[in-house]
Swiss-Prot record:
PANTHER family: 30S RIBOSOMAL PROTEIN S14, SMALL RIBOSOMAL SUBUNIT PROTEIN US14M. Transmembrane segments: none annotated. The lineage of its organism: Bacteria, Bacillati, Bacillota, Clostridia, Eubacteriales. SUPFAM superfamilies: Glucocorticoid receptor-like (DNA-binding domain) (SSF57716). Belongs to the universal ribosomal protein uS14 family. Zinc-binding uS14 subfamily. Part of the 30S ribosomal subunit. Contacts proteins S3 and S10. GO terms for cellular component: cytoplasm; small ribosomal subunit. The keyword Coiled coil does not apply. This is Small ribosomal subunit protein uS14. GO terms for biological process: translation. PROSITE patterns: RIBOSOMAL_S14 (PS00527). Its cofactor is Zn(2+). Zn(2+) binds at residues 24, 27, 40, 43. It comes from Acetivibrio thermocellus (strain ATCC 27405 / DSM 1237 / JCM 9322 / NBRC 103400 / NCIMB 10682 / NRRL B-4536 / VPI 7372) (Clostridium thermocellum).
Length: 61
C-alpha cells in the first residue's frame, strides 16, 4: 500500500504537467502501472487469477 499522504498529494493538480504521474486505482502503487487497465501489475495479476478481468487468460504454449 502506498502512503495515504502521497496518494492525496498525487490527486491534486500539479503546478507543472510533467510532475503528474499514474497510480494504481486499487492500491496506489506508482510503479509497474498498466495504462490499459488503470492498475499495477500486482493487482492485475490478482484480478486476472480470480477471473475478474474479462478476456484475460493465462498464457500457455
Amino acid at each position: 500500500m502506498a502512503k495515504k499522504s502521497l496518494i492525496v498529494k498525487q490527486q491534486r493538480k500539479p503546478k507543472y504537467r510533467t510532475r503528474a504521474y499514474n497510480r494504481c486505482k486499487l492500491c496506489g502503487r506508482p510503479h509497474a502501472y498498466m495504462r490499459k487497465f488503470g492498475i499495477c501489475r500486482l493487482c492485475f495479476r490478482d484480478l486476472a487469477y480470480k477471473g475478474q478481468i474479462p478476456g484475460v487468460r493465462k498464457a500457455s504454449w
